[in-house]
């Protein structure tokens, strides 16, 4: 079985690295890109199919909600998991209404992603 391809988008390099290490424990998951740059991610998505994007709400030059719309316009079946330090209740609801498949608070254990 082909591993699930994952893009990690977060403004903090340490968060990107931590998620990659955590996901790297599972041989059925392959992190194909780690970035905080929306243009880099969009270029990648235009070229390669991606199963999941782990997406922060706050990114340099854009926000996760705007980027979610762009991602879905390129790859409608790509799943989106929001990861944010924002207030869980308000932003979780907004994320799901915007089309995300899930929401994880950074204030919780990152093992919730795994």
PLM regions and their residue ranges:
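Short amphipathic alpha-helix used as the core "switch/output" element in two-component signaling
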Residues: 43, 65-76
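Acidic, metal-coordinating helix/loop segments flanking the phosphotransfer/catalytic sites
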Residues: 34-52
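Residue-level signal for the "D+5" position in two-component response regulator receiver
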Residues: 34, 59-62
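C-terminal output helix
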Residues: 90, 108-114
């Amino acid at each position: 079985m082909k591993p699930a391809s994952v893009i990690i988008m977060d403004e903090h390099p340490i968060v990107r690295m931590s998620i990659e290490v955590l996901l790297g424990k599972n041989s059925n998951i392959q992190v194909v890109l780690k970035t905080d740059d929306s243009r880099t991610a969009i270029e990648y998505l235009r070229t390669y199919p991606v199963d999941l994007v782990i997406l922060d709400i706050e990114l340099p030059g854009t926000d996760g909600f705007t980027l979610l719309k762009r991602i879905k316009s390129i790859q409608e079946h790509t799943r989106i998991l929001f990861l944010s330090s924002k207030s869980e209740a308000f932003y979780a609801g907004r994320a799901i209404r915007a089309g995300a498949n899930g929401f994880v608070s950074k204030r919780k254990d990152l093992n919730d992603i795994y």
